């Protein structure tokens, strides 16, 4: 790293991993530039289930209370066959009485993390509409090349963290073990909370091993705090 200067890291991608990492680095008094391809952060994606290990990270970030306020507590998983019999009936308390999960919309999670990042505005800077194509490493820095607002982007950093998703083209090729798409797919939708089912359970309905439907409680989204999903 450059001597007599505070370290300056780049994080490529403003998803949950990138934003959480930015917060942790800023806590260590490290300058962070978030490089995001999108022109602005928008609600995208569907719900996800935070496991106890993930919740421990948000507690460390000081964000657990906000995650619990916006998300939905999930105490277990039930998987039902067409006959009505349960294929899966698993509950967190079977592992530990204090364990649980939290269902939450991906955009809500990013909203919580983004707000926390704004608290470190003297250390975290945002460069939106920035598309990175190439990284060039030297002995003491990483050169980041791409475009920003349609113009050439070229900047050196002490370190670069690649957090732009599972389909990132920036990872070393030797890290990519599988480069073929899955031979199956899924459809997602966001609907109001289903009160006919236990709202603390991740419900799954199985038709053999080829078809499954799931209903995950995900709490609320910031712009509609009274509508649970």
Please give the residue ranges for each predicted region.
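Beta1/beta-strand and adjacent pyrophosphate-binding region of the FAD-binding site
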Residues: 2-17
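Glycine-rich FAD pyrophosphate-binding loop
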Residues: 10, 26-46
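Conserved Rossmann-like nucleotide-cofactor binding loop
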Residues: 17, 40, 167
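Short, well-ordered alpha-helix to beta-strand connector turns
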Residues: 29, 74, 157-158
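Conserved H-loop
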Residues: 31, 64-65, 123
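Active-site-adjacent segment of FAD-dependent monooxygenases/related oxidoreductases
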Residues: 46, 50-116
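Conserved FAD-binding catalytic core of PHBH/FMO-like flavoproteins
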Residues: 114-115, 119, 125-229
């Amino acid at each position: 790293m450059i001597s007599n200067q505070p370290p300056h890291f780049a994080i490529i991608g403003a998803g949950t991993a990138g934003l959480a990492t930015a917060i942790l680095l800023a806590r260590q008094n490290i300058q962070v530039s978030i490089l995001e391809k999108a022109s602005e952060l928008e609600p995208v994606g569907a719900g996800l289930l935070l496991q106890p290990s993930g919740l421990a990270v948000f507690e460390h970030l000081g964000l657990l209370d906000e995650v619990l306020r916006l998300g939905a507590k999930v105490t277990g998983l039930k998987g039902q066959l067409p006959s009505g019999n349960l294929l899966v009936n698993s509950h967190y308390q079977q592992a530990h009485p204090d364990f649980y999960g939290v269902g939450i919309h991906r955009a809500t999670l990013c909203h919580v993390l983004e707000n926390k990042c704004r608290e470190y505005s003297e250390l975290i800077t945002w460069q939106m509409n920035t598309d990175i194509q190439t990284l060039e490493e030297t002995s003491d820095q990483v050169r980041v090349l791409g475009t920003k607002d349609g113009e050439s982007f070229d900047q050196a950093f002490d370190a670069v963290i690649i957090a732009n998703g599972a389909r990132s083209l920036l990872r070393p090729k030797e890290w990519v073990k599988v480069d073929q798409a899955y031979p199956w797919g899924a459809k997602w939708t966001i609907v109001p909370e289903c009160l006919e089912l236990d709202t603390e359970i991740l419900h799954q309905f199985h038709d053999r091993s080829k078809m499954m439907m799931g209903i995950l409680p995900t709490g609320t989204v910031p712009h509609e705090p009274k509508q649970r999903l």
